[in-house]
Amino acid sequence: MQKGNLQDHLNGIGETKMDWPSRLKLALGAARGLAYLHSSSAVGIPIVHRDFKSTNVLLNANFEAKISDFGLAKLLPEGQETSVTARVLGTFGYFDPEYTSTGKLTLQSDVYAFGVVLLELLTGRRAVDINQGPNDQNLVLQVRHILNDRKKLRKLIDPDMGRNSYTIESIAMFANLASRCVRVESGDRPSMPECVKELQLVFCTNVKGRGVGFRMG
């Protein structure tokens, strides 16, 4: 893809730093892609990507998100639409805790990984940063407890985002969605279609709050 992957742009390798509307657009595009895989529309039965992460979100010339690398994808056969027992594969930092402890792969395993990517979009940090101390390497563990605290939430916002590009209300809504996606129990997480709807609302809330127009795509 012409613009590389999402992690490149979040960690300063890409040619430009993304503002908040661009990040919301990418989150929404990725959510739609996962929702499509989960819906049975692609091949007639649900598909779990199993390795969704920021390096597998590619950006085209218009900064639209395209999901890549389906090498670990798993079909959920008829009669097993909720879960399938599978060897634990994926990328450290994006693993669904329930999947790693039980070996049962579900659509919600992708939702957890999607939540991690949402946190990367919000903070500009990596899912795992080995340059940090042992207790601060895992992004989810580092920020999960303050995602719904508006006062502390401000400290998590990527400083490379222009302050005029976001509203605190949209940030809070986005952080709340991310916090629910990375809940330990898979049954407590939203579905990908629900994520799509909530991100559309976050996008519109940000546009309305800023008083400007921006094409959602």
Sequence positions of predicted segments:
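Conserved eukaryotic protein kinase-like
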Residues: 1-217
